[in-house]
Amino acid sequence: MSEQGSYDIQQVLKALPHRYPLLLVDRVKSMDLGERIHAVKGVTMNEEFFQGHFPGAPIMPGVLQVEAMAQAAAILGIETLELAGTGKLVFFMGIENAKFRKPVTPGCLLDLEVEFTQKRSRVYKFRGKASVEGVTTSEAEFTAMIADPPA
């Protein structure tokens, strides 16, 4: 498949329906359509979840790292299938083998690397890894489907 250059936040917003406070992809660094994506999330102290996770020792929840990987996967799926702007949504169906390795704290640049592992009709499987400065912070496999938004 073809290699795509980086996507700024405006292109991310066109591909994803997510908005603040749950938009967890800031930029796409590279994408090989139909294969893989490398996106990033700048983690700042301004994130709402740091108010309660944990006061005095802020750590990004692992489930939000998985959500960030899923959003990167959604961009990959939407762009691969040329569905940006059609209103189609990517819905999470399952998470498997999630592992949380290292904490992510304010000031980190979270790298999100996701690849397709299986493609069938409207159901897709992905493998993702989140890392900071080359150190894996979390990883997971997940299943998603592409569908019309709920009526």
UniProtKB/Swiss-Prot annotation:
Its EC number is 4.2.1.59. It is found in: Cytoplasm. It comes from the Bacteria. Pfam families: FabA. It catalyses: a (3R)-hydroxyacyl-[ACP] = a (2E)-enoyl-[ACP] + H2O. It is an enzyme of class 4 (lyase). GO terms for biological process: fatty acid biosynthetic process; lipid A biosynthetic process. The active site is at 53. GO terms for cellular component: cytoplasm; membrane. One of its GO terms (molecular function) is (3R)-hydroxyacyl-[acyl-carrier-protein] dehydratase activity. Keywords: Cytoplasm, Lipid A biosynthesis, Lipid biosynthesis, Lipid metabolism, Lyase. Belongs to the thioester dehydratase family. FabZ subfamily. Involved in unsaturated fatty acids biosynthesis. Catalyzes the dehydration of short chain beta-hydroxyacyl-ACPs and long chain saturated and unsaturated beta-hydroxyacyl-ACPs. This is 3-hydroxyacyl-[acyl-carrier-protein] dehydratase FabZ. It comes from Erythrobacter litoralis (strain HTCC2594). The gene is fabZ.
